[in-house]
Curated annotation (Swiss-Prot):
Family under the similarity heading: Belongs to the TBCC family.
Upper classification of the organism: Eukaryota, Amoebozoa, Evosea, Eumycetozoa, Dictyostelia
C-CAP/cofactor C-like domain: residues covered: 216-366
Keywords: Coiled coil
Protein encoded by which gene: tbcc
Chain intervals with Low complexity compositional bias: 172-192, 228-257
A cellular component annotation (GO) from this entry: cytoplasm
Family annotation (InterPro entries): C-CAP_CF_C-like (IPR017901), CAP/MinC_C (IPR016098), TBCC (IPR027684), TBCC_N (IPR031925), Tubulin-bd_cofactor_C_dom (IPR012945)
GO biological process: post-chaperonin tubulin folding pathway; protein folding; tubulin complex assembly
The protein's name in its UniProt record: Tubulin-specific chaperone C
Cited PROSITE patterns: C_CAP_COFACTOR_C
Quaternary data: Supercomplex made of cofactors A to E. Cofactors A and D function by capturing and stabilizing tubulin in a quasi-native conformation. Cofactor E binds to the cofactor D-tubulin complex; interaction with cofactor C then causes the release of tubulin polypeptides that are committed to the native state.
Function of the protein: Tubulin-folding protein; involved in the final step of the tubulin folding pathway.
């Protein structure tokens, strides 16, 4: 009886063992089946992702090509309609081209992870080519009006002097011609001296060290054209009443030049200087070769700003577009309508124009030198569609920097943000 029970137990154990084996085999097969299913699903998802990335890359390239074509079409239109181009229309076209170029660079930066290295290289080469075309077109079709007007006035004065002299008797004509020749020699010598001396007038600020300058200058403050103006006045003193009338007209023209209607300004070769721009508006601003300087604009630049080769300087500016080339250790407190662009630059900091202004007012409101800062008037800016105080689509563009030397998706090491 006992033997029978033992046999039954053994049989049960064997059956249970077989069942366990079968169960394990089934579980193993089920695991393999699920693993295979997951692998197939992953492959399918990857194919879909690859296809989606390919579609996105194609759409990105198409968008970039459309923007590039638009820039080229605008350049061709300007070139083909040279006689019909108006200054305001040209300025608007160039501003739109600058914004399109900035958008191309921004799109390329954000999409570099889905574009091939060949595509990225081609796009960057195209950006550089378009930049050169735009600069060349600007140089050709947007001449510097203020400089040409000044030259014409000088020529007019000289002709009028000669005409009056020709009406005098022979002896006086001979004497006056000798005097005029001497005056011309003095003018040439003075011009040679001026070229190496600082300049401060309506179109140029150049060559100063350790100075605080307020722009626009008053007539008596202008440096660089004074000798020429004095020489013209001496010639005019030898003329008759008709020439005195011409002299009055010239003075009226000079007074008009000192009005708030100003075009381009070029600032260059300054060291340890502070420049306060307090004009009504500028159409363009070019800055080059500054060391340890501060530039602040209390009014907008209704166009582009180009800044090159500056070191350890601070800029507080409002404009439609700003391009920064080959600068080191500089801070830009700005409000812009398109993404700032840097190239060949390092240790660059960006902050908000208005936030920086308010911080300085709080820290230095008791110092006399900061009276200029307290003169902030948003109406000046709103007149040219720059609203600094309300929250709008341009409020944060100061921080959306495009670094032409950095095409990776992660943050460029060449610039950083200063927030208050």
């Amino acid at each position: 009886m006992s033997n029978n029970n033992n046999n039954n137990n053994n049989n049960n154990d064997e059956e249970n063992s077989k069942l366990d084996i079968v169960k394990k085999q089934f579980q193993e097969k089920e695991k393999q089946r699920l693993q295979s299913k997951l692998e197939k699903r992953e492959i399918s998802n990857k194919e879909q992702i690859d296809q989606s990335s390919s579609n996105i890359a194609s759409e990105t390239l198409l968008l970039i090509n459309n923007l590039s074509d638009d820039i080229e079409n605008r350049l061709n239109e300007i070139s083909n309609n040279t006689n019909e181009n108006k200054a305001e229309d040209l300025k608007e076209s160039y501003n739109q081209m600058e914004e399109s170029l900035s958008e191309i660079n921004s799109i390329t930066t954000m999409s570099s992870h889905i574009l091939t290295s060949y595509d990225v290289k081609s796009i960057l080469e195209n950006i550089d080519n378009l930049r050169k075309q735009i600069d060349k077109s600007k140089e050709k079709y947007m001449p510097k009006q203020k400089l040409s007007l000044t030259r014409k006035k000088t020529k007019t004065t000289t002709v009028s002097t000669k005409t009056t002299s020709s009406k005098e008797d022979t002896n006086e004509t001979f004497n006056n011609n000798n005097n005029n020749n001497n005056d011309n020699d003095n003018t040439d010598n003075n011009n040679n001296k001026i070229s190496t001396e600082p300049i401060f007038n309506l179109i140029n600020i150049k060559g100063f060290k350790n100075k605080e300058l307020f722009y626009p200058p008053k007539k008596e403050e202008e440096i660089g054209n004074q000798d020429i103006n004095n020489n013209n006045n001496n010639n005019n003193n030898n003329n008759n009443n008709n020439n005195n009338n011409n002299n009055n007209n010239n003075n009226n023209n000079n007074n008009n030049n000192n009005s708030n209607s100003i075009n381009d300004l070029f600032i260059s070769d300054l060291t340890d200087c502070t420049v306060i721009l307090d004009m009504k508006v500028l159409t363009a601003l070019k800055i080059n070769n500054l060391v340890n300087c501060k530039i602040r604009a209390n009014s907008p630049i209704d166009g582009s700003i180009f800044i090159d080769n500056c070191i350890n300087s601070i800029f507080s500016l409002v404009s439609r577009q700003i391009r920064i080339h080959y600068c080191t250790d500089c801070q830009f407190n700005i409000f812009v309508k398109s993404n700032p662009i840097i190239e060949g630059s390092k240790q660059i900091k960006f902050s908000s124009y208005l936030q920086n202004l308010k911080q300085q007012q709080q820290q230095q409101q008791q110092q006399e030198q900061e009276k200029v800062l307290s003169s902030f008037d948003n109406k000046r800016f709103k007149e040219y569609s720059f609203d600094l105080e309300s929250n709008n689509i341009d409020s944060d563009k100061w921080k959306l920097v495009n670094d032409f030397d950095w095409i990776q998706q992660k943050q460029s090491p060449n610039w950083s943000l200063v927030e208050y």
